[in-house]
Amino acid sequence: MIGKAKDWVIRYIDYKKLPSLVGQESGKGGYKEGLILLIVSQLVNALAFFVSFPLSMVFTPLQFEPVQLLLSLSVLSFIGMVAFYVIGLTIFLAGTLLGGKGTPDNLLYLLSVMNLCSRIVTAPFVILSAVEPISFLMLLAVSLIGLYGLYAVYLAVRGSLSLSPLRAIASMLAGLLVVILVLAVLGLSAGQV
């Protein structure tokens, strides 16, 4: 699996090879494989944050509570996984309503591959973002990689659902709308909006 992930990341980084990665992986996995990749990507992300937290204390001393940090990262990882499936299935539903001809398991698998690649690429930047003098640059790099990730998601949606470019973007916007609505509801329930 490590060799396969390494190949994915190398092709993910090169925008010219990214479409061929989507084409090659399309139809090769389902819910089970996608879930495994999603769990691995959440572990990579949690590990990056776990490593970066003690580094940040060099510049702003706090009491380091590893158990509390692990518990928080576990809860956030679980919430992230649920959100991934809700957004992915919303994109699938919108894409299907717009004439898409794919399966949800293929879409979720491709999104999981793109998510894993994105997490592996951003992990070093997340760790280095704890170093105060360069934190802004590292967070800027993470943001730019996130924007590139939208391109990867676009290719995955377009490839897995056989959609035109505009319909693929519309499907992605439906997923974004769900995120905004959920955050608005959570904000209203917490009295923040």
Where are the language model's segments positioned?
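Terminal transmembrane helical module of multi-pass membrane proteins
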Residues: 128-193
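Residue-level signature of transmembrane alpha-helical entry/exit and packing/kink sites
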Residues: 30-37, 68, 72, 76, ...
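Alpha-helical membrane-inserting segments
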Residues: 44-56, 86-98, 120-129, 178-186, ...
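Alpha-helical transmembrane spans of integral membrane proteins, capturing the lipid-embedded, hydrophobic core
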Residues: 34, 38-42, 46, 77-85, ...
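N-terminal juxtamembrane cytosolic/stromal segments of multi-pass membrane proteins
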Residues: 1-57
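Alpha-helical transmembrane segments with an aromatic anchor "belt"
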Residues: 60-127
